[in-house]
């Protein structure tokens, strides 16, 4: 009995009036990691942009593991000193459905003598974990997934697992049809398809879609060659005939994919393919057929069942009948739940003696992770900058997802009603933090606990903390906070513990804070020389708050400036009066007479002196005048 039958030829049978119409080119971005300039690579001379949008890391020369790896000369690796989570944050990506592919590389340095093992996530969902030996397997030197990017960005992160530094050769973001690989119930924008394998069967070789001259809307898939499923298990077939119904919407398979095949033999009539998979996962299996065997010319000549992990998914498959003729593409799709570690596909002949297959695709179905509230992510990023958070923390990507790699020091909780993660705790004590605590911390509205003790944080305690009403524990002890305690802390009605000891705070503890704490919470204000006003601290009495001290200092300074200004004005006025009196005295009659007498006396003295001087000159020598 057929458990499920999703026939992709139903989509193909309309044959593509849609695909025959001109479509705009799909969005495509290729990044050559570590490169300082754009490059093109043969044989298609694809354009790779220089390295952009990375959060850190080190550029280096690259060693390409296999021949299918793009022939690029550089990579970017992320040493553990830069933190466990490093990302590429790519912006201005049009809303749509994408194939995202990341090629890995090996650092071309003697000190890097082993392949790194690490995890990869896209938009907060982990899609791949590298396994030992990946660098020698063609289909393991990259990770690929089909994902909807709806927020205008693509965040691709690499998570250290303690086995070497993640090293990335290239990143590709290639747009595909919005309905590509729709597998029916359960498919949608919240689903990611991770490529487990793609095989082209028969005499063909490993190729990309572009090698097949496939449609760009196919996403330039890589097809790994499968020459045989086992010794004496099959024989190859090939043709140069045109294949109908191949490169059509929404998947746009290349025609060349259907021009080779494997056919079972008399020794082993069943065609069997097995793939190692992760247990307790769902997989989407796509089987490709085209009747290219010259010995099969009519309906009923070749009929077989498709059995996956012991269950019959498709009964009485007759390719010619179902595709509409010879040399026509047929695609069958099934969703399979696998409890063990092996997925096995068996084609069991019922008529004609042999089964045939052209290509196989297997995807792991992954439910996209819920993301953290955007405002809270933004607030944490501003805190990271304001506090000078060391790079070893690796605060990149989403703080809560993937759940296997949350940010160190940030505690997360999922709100099932809104399907969003939020931050309910900060544990960053004794981490060498400096700088100041920004007002944006109040945007973490779900915080229940803040522990920033034993750092070197300066400045005032943000008054905005009073709006985080869920806060139960606030420990800012042994820092360098100064100024007064904000009165808004009295609005924290859920507060159980308040530790502000070991800082440089001053002024009176606000009544709203002290009164509530005396009755409901544990508190510690010691080792703040300027604090006063509650039991255990000096009485405020003559003590002045820092605000009052500033006010007094300002008043004294202003009074001094006024006194100086008045003194200068008085002095200038006095000078002007004296000058006016002198001028008036010279203009009086008695003053003129005295001036004439004085002038006559001076002239007489002057003449007498001149006479004496002339005589002395004659006596002393010849005159200089003739």
Swiss-Prot record:
The keyword Ubl conjugation does not apply. Pfam families: LRR_8, Malectin_like. InterPro entries: Leu-rich_rpt, LRR_dom_sf, Malectin-like_Carb-bd_dom. SUPFAM superfamilies: L domain-like. Keywords: Cell membrane, Glycoprotein, Leucine-rich repeat, Membrane, Receptor, Repeat, Signal, Transmembrane, Transmembrane helix. Belongs to the RLP family. LRR repeats lie at residues 420-444, 445-468, 470-492, 493-516. Residues 603-626 are annotated as: Disordered. This is Receptor-like protein 4. Glycans are attached at residues 61, 282, 333, 417, 451, 482, 524. The chain crosses the membrane at residues 550-570. GO terms for cellular component: endosome; Golgi apparatus; plasma membrane; trans-Golgi network. Residues 23-549 are extracellular. It is a single-pass type I membrane protein. It is found in: Cell membrane. Residues 1-22 form the signal peptide. Residues 571-626 are cytoplasmic.
